């Protein structure tokens, strides 16, 4: 599974979710969906805007973790 580590970059940049939402042009609810791992997909355009707003690379906010076996 792919994990979005947006909180880490927000803390490093001292930026609020509200500010990120305004800069990227997506709702706070959609940012929350990304942060909580509930997103089924993300547009490359949205990822680009998030990276621009946070001044980071995609690898700084995306992490791959193997699914846990139940």
What does each model-identified segment do?
Residues 15-33:
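Short alpha-helical DNA-recognition segment
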Residues 7, 18, 48:
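Residues within the helices of the helix-turn-helix
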Residues 8, 33, 40, 62-70:
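Short, charged recognition helix plus adjacent turn
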Residues 10, 21, 51:
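The alpha-helix within a helix-turn-helix
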Residues 23, 41, 52-53:
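Residue cluster at the C-terminal edge of the helix-turn-helix DNA-binding motif
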């Amino acid at each position: 599974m792919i994990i979005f580590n947006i909180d880490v970059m927000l803390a490093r940049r001292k930026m609020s979710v509200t500010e990120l939402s305004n800069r990227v042009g997506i709702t706070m609810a959609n940012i929350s969906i990304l942060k909580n791992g509930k997103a089924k997909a993300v547009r490359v355009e949205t990822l680009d805007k998030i990276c621009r707003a946070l001044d980071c690379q995609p690898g700084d906010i995306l992490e791959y973790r193997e699914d846990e076996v139940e």
